[in-house]
Amino acid sequence: MNIAWAKKRGNRVLMYGCGIGPVSSPGNRRAAGRIIDKYVDAITLRESHSARELQDMGVTHPKITVTADPALLLDPAPAEAVEAFLAAQGLDPARKHLLFVLRPWPGFEEKMPLFARAAEEYYETRGLVPVFFALEPKRDLPVAEATAALVSCPHHVIAAPHDGHLIVGMMGKMEAVVSMRLHALIFAAGLGVPLVGVVYDPKVSGFLDYLQETRYLDLETVAEDTLSALIDDALAQGVNGYSARRLRALAEENEQAARRLLEEAP
């Protein structure tokens, strides 16, 4: 209703850097499609799956542009601030680290030992110290702590700071990121850090498909060998600077769309 109210008050309406869905109820899909089509002037989307969702909802009036998530433009904190944060968490800057970003979800508990075994495997074979990172601490910290409790090698559990720039900077220090959380994957992609996605929701696979990123698997299909194969592949790739620059350029198109809408004659 905020969209309709804004338009009725004479404002131009831009849906900025959105992901659409899932909206499963037929009635809700019709209602959402009708409101968006009637009251929105332009939409920028973070991946192509959302464009298909809008098309299926019957949205044809607004100008739709597939760009990338605006979070990709979040710059890392200064190096000294990142190093101070990691030191405060007990991380040795001389060691290399593998980041796990896990979250509660139905079916996760039975897969938890597989993530713990992967953490131990890469410590034993590559010397990568596992870091279990709670991106949304209130929800994710119990999962991070429970997984870490299954690990016998040296490891760290970190709750995300409030400073997003610090989060991005920390991720830039990782050898690879294994994540269920979409925004951890977005941050890693924006930095070019090798990533492995664990999909619990179509928005995660939609983002990775848009990146043409094949290193992901559904949570229910996680197995020791398949998870290890994807992590091996990610580590072999190394940092992808070209991909990071391309994504940031796409994310900047959100701002360009907003500027165009403001400059249009009423």
Predicted regions and their residues:
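Active-site anion-handling motifs in enzyme catalytic cores
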Residues: 1-266
